[in-house]
Regions:
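Catalytic cysteine-centered active-site loop
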Residues: 57, 61-115
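A conserved glycine-rich beta-strand in the N-terminal activation segment of trypsin-fold
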Residues: 124-126
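Residue-level signal for alpha-helical context at structural boundaries
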Residues: 21, 36-38, 69, 73, ...
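Short beta-strand segments that buttress and anchor functional surface loops
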Residues: 116-121
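Intrinsically disordered, low-complexity
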Residues: 1-63, 153-154, 161-162
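Aromatic- and glycine-rich peptidoglycan recognition patches
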Residues: 27, 47-48, 53-56, 92-108, ...
Length: 162
């Protein structure tokens, strides 16, 4: 007894759509090789290291001028003008007088210092960068420099603003 062979069926060819062109690779304009020094301040942040990074860009870039507040390349600031401008770039307001800046923020001990804290002296102020060092507007001869916290004077206080 033979059965009639089943009709051969071919699977239907899959429906195809025309191939979409491959997406073009995303390209971005090349970033400039050099950027202005110092770079603009980032948005306000609670990170003391961001304050240090911004402050360090001014080393050798701005002159010391007693009473100065012009923190620009080739401009002039004094110690409190420097700290006032650096913190202002992060939305923190300080007066232009080192004797008043010691009243801002929270008092901390030397052992508690973190990058971004103020180092306050009688008649002077700087920003702690870590490792027992600070950045500050030192003098007309030296400008904005990095020094040991105990470079010339005994600090009278340490303040945390962030």
């Amino acid at each position: 007894d033979t059965q009639p062979a089943a009709p051969e069926t071919q699977p239907a060819a899959p429906e195809t759509q025309p191939a979409a062109p491959a997406p073009a690779p995303e390209t971005q304009p090349a970033a400039p090789e050099t950027q202005p020094t110092p770079a603009p301040a980032p948005a306000p942040s609670g990170n003391g290291q961001s304050i240090v990074d911004y402050a360090m860009q001014w080393v050798g870039q701005c002159n010391y001028v007693w009473g100065g507040t012009n923190l620009t390349p080739g401009g002039g600031v004094d110690c409190s003008g420097f700290t006032m401008n650096v913190y202002a770039a992060f939305g923190i307001s300080l007066p232009h007088y080192s004797g008043e800046q010691i009243n801002y923020g929270q008092a901390v001990s030397y052992e508690q210092l973190q990058p971004g804290d103020l180092i306050c002296f009688s008649g002077h102020v700087g920003i702690y960068i870590g490792g027992g060092m600070m950045v500050h507007a030192a003098s007309a001869e030296r400008g904005i420099v990095v020094d040991n916290v105990f470079y010339n004077k005994q600090p009278i206080g340490y303040r945390r603003l962030v």
